[in-house]
Amino acid sequence: MNLPAKLGARGLGVVIFAIALASGARAQVLNSGARTITLQAVLSDSITVSLSSNAVNFNLTAGNASNPGSTSVTATTSWALKPSVGSLKLYAFFSSSTAALTDGAGNNIPSADFQISNNAGPFNALTNTVPFGGANAGLQLSSTPILGNNRTGSRNDVMNLNINLAPLPSLPAATYTGTLTIQAQAI
């Protein structure tokens, strides 16, 4: 027996209607025009420096070369830099080489007698001209080459501070104050 005879006229009509309905459903798909969204994500270049302490005290001994600070200071430098940057440098500086610390009455401790040991290295006086601060009143603490794998990163520099009073044997007793600044530069 063939299919039309098995289904009968009514069954055959139902099958034909179902096929027509299914093919008609596909023919009724309607899509809108495509619309786009423009995306822009900006990661700005940045450098930040944070310090573990913003105050260090010294108990000075007249004429003594070793007058260490009360605490070390850790400078944490963090960055996100553009591909054109080749290095990141960290500097310490005073605004004046002749009066890094002063008693306000004309007696001064020059930057040449203020010393920093960075990351357990030797003590160095602040006698260089750096991009910031006064002439002959700075010190480059570190230089980090910026390569493809460290365009974003951070580093710590642990600074021990000392005031050398050996060159100042007649410095009068007083309270001496000053401001040491730490700043980074990407080049």
Where in this protein do the model-derived segments appear?
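Bacterial N-terminal signal peptides that target proteins for export
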Residues: 2-13
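Bacterial N-terminal signal peptides
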Residues: 13-20
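N-terminal small/polar-rich segments of proteins
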Residues: 27-122, 128, 138-187
